[in-house]
Amino acid sequence: PLLLTSPRAPTRTRVPGPPIFTPLLISQARGSGAYPHPMPGLDPLPERAVIREVGPRDGFQNEPDRIPTDDKVRLIDALAHTGLRRIEVTSFVRAEVVPQLADAADVLERVGIPEGVSVAVLVPNAQGLEAALEHVERIDEVAVFLSASETHNRHNVNRSVDESLAGLTELLPRIAAAGLRPSASISTAFGCPYEGHVAAERVYAIAAQLAEAGAQEISFGDTTGMANPRQVRAFFTQALRTLPGVELTAHFHNTRGQGLANVLAALEAGVDSFESSFGELGGCPFPPGATGNVATEDLVSMLHEMGVATGIDLAALLAAGRDAQTVLGRPLGSHLLTAGPVVWNG
């Protein structure tokens, strides 16, 4: 039976300011055994990586059939007990624009997320932030967003990039003043389905303005899966030099099968923070061909096999993915949900 409901969770005690992420041990990464052979010649990878699960927002918003709130709450609660440290629970957007997220407030109030797991929400504008702040005791992080390309930004939020920047740079200090961690997401950072190439210098300039306004973290999104590993490595190598002191996060889509290759390229450049979606759910509902975030299960498996710690229980994560398949009534795109984790014999 899948209509189990989670009891209304008690108000969480939240320490103001950015969430503290406890260092992870390499031994935590070895769910099925780290890769058993040395790989000389490769750049050293980070010892650990932090994963921000965006499936409950980025994944659910793309589903054409309404997902019952009870099911959303149960799936989010399951994710919160996998070892994930950060979960983007929902977005406060207009219900007529994204009907699937019309229950944002109800979901946020009902999820039973334990201490130590950072709750994030996405907001598009001042109205969205005001709605989110009505639930300030249930939130740790608030993300704002815009696109690097003019056409995609018009399609997504009906504003020019400059207009979006003007509004968002006013929101970021308000988020911090509420005791929450402000972050920003830049879509079409590696290419636009309408305009094609997006200059990296343009993306860095947008990111710099957001950082100056108070964004502690900036996520760079490959919105329609146009990025390639060589491009990603060069992009983040320069971004880490251009934006010192800002946490840089990579968000890849697997639209053309290059998602995990791009993750590896970002790791080799020095990035240790990633966004992904359990079951490979999601994408962006507006541009063509934008389906398929990198699957969290596949990402965690690859990281663990390379000896990069995440602190995530892969078996528990797979159980949440299987439950999501049942709720949605179809197989999901995660390779690990089909093949299972790697098992080393001998």
Predicted region positions:
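Residue-identity detector for glycine
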Residues: 17, 31-33
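Prokaryotic Sec-type signal peptides and long signal-anchor helices
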Residues: 10, 24-25, 30, 239
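Leucine-biased recognition of intrinsically disordered, low-complexity hydrophobic segments
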Residues: 2-4, 24-25
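Short, intrinsically disordered low-complexity segments
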Residues: 7, 11-13, 29, 56, ...
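Intrinsic low-complexity, disordered N-terminal segments enriched in polar/charged/small residues
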Residues: 3, 9-11, 18-20
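Alpha-helical hydrophobic packing sites
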Residues: 7, 13-15, 61, 272
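Catalytic cores and adjacent flexible loops of soluble metabolic enzymes
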Residues: 33-346
